[in-house]
UniProtKB/Swiss-Prot annotation:
Binds 1 zinc ion. The active site is at E104. PROSITE patterns: CYT_DCMP_DEAMINASES_1, CYT_DCMP_DEAMINASES_2. GO terms for molecular function: cytidine deaminase activity; identical protein binding; zinc ion binding. This is Cytidine deaminase. The keyword Cell membrane does not apply. Its EC number is 3.5.4.5. Residues 48-168, 187-295 form the CMP/dCMP-type deaminase domain. Keywords: Hydrolase, Metal-binding, Zinc. The lineage of its organism: Bacteria, Pseudomonadati, Pseudomonadota, Gammaproteobacteria, Vibrionales.
Length: 295
């Protein structure tokens, strides 16, 4: 990954490459740009907003983990706070393809796990597939979300997904990224369980009521959280493990460095993530211990 990031930086225009390199290679870079940092990039580059976001896509794509397709896709989400979040696609050799995370899903979940309450726009290398269009239609900002592609005028999500089916069609009025706290608690004193519980409490699961969260502990001691992101169309739902893995990937972590995992989910939900979580962790490393709690 580091080599691909270096290569991407070498492609950047000279007008802002030094400043961008300083940001991206900083030890505390978290694959986001603050509104102020992005404004400085705009000033240095002299580019239009849309052109600069497209120009930065190779940086996002450099984070991709695509051992199956070797097709590296990047995405950049702008949260309603003005901060920009990078994302990339993620695949798992040995796992069924349904465990794949698309770049759009990665960038959106990245923003969500860092506290964003909505997405203003998303910039991607290629036209979003139907799966991702439906995933984005779950968002709090689905009606106003803009999609930017290279060499094209921005369009709204609803232009890409006319006569769309979404949460409202199932009687749900709160979208993905709505601020929630399900208020679940546990006396379990295992740290990773408590961290997974934190993720569970912000999860979006209005259709199955399987509020759930995952926590991953790395060898470095860092812990990454993932909350379940359910979708009105069911299949585009993003499991909590994949959300947690996306957070780790966007911090430059290697999946080989996962030391332990925990899953907490609702005991009364209509589905369970346990079997799929175990299966996906198994293909990453069969020795990863998984703690489990059903509340």
């Amino acid at each position: 990954m580091r080599n691909r990031i270096e290569q991407a930086l070498q492609q950047m225009p000279a007008s802002f490459a030094p400043y961008l390199r300083e940001l991206v290679l900083a030890k505390d870079f978290d694959a986001t740009f603050s509104a102020e940092q992005y404004q400085q990039l705009l000033t240095l580059s002299g580019m239009e907003d849309s052109d600069l976001r497209v120009a930065l896509l190779p940086i996002a794509a450099a984070y991709s983990y695509a051992p199956i397709s070797e097709f590296y896709v990047g995405a950049i989400v702008r949260g309603i706070s003005g901060r920009l979040y990078l994302g990339a696609n993620m695949e798992f050799t040995g796992a069924q393809l349904g465990q794949t995370v698309h770049a759009e899903q990665c960038a959106i979940s990245h923003a969500w796990m860092k506290g964003e309450k909505g997405v203003a726009d998303i910039t991607i290398n290629f036209s979003p597939c139907g799966h991702c269009r439906q995933f984005m239609n779950e968002l709090t900002t689905a009606s106003s979300l803009k999609i930017q592609l290279p060499k094209r005028a921005a369009k709204t999500l609803q232009e890409y997904l006319p006569e769309s089916f979404g949460p409202a069609d199932l009687g749900i009025d709160s979208g993905l990224m709505s601020p929630v706290n399900h208020g679940k608690t546990s006396d379990d004193d295992e740290e990773l369980i408590q961290q997974a519980l934190r993720a569970m409490n912000i999860s979006h699961s209005p259709y199955t009521q399987n509020f759930s969260g995952v926590a991953l502990k790395m060898r470095s001691g860092a812990i990454y959280l993932g909350a379940y992101a359910e979708n009105a169309a069911f299949n585009p739902s993003l499991p909590p493990l994949q959300v947690a893995l996306a957070q780790a990937m966007m911090m430059g972590e290697s999946f080989e460095d996962i030391e332990a995992a925990a899953l907490v989910e609702s005991a009364t939900g209509k589905i369970s993530h346990l079997a799929d979580t175990q299966a996906t962790l198994e293909v990453i490393n069969p020795d990863i211990p998984l703690s489990y709690l059903s509340l």
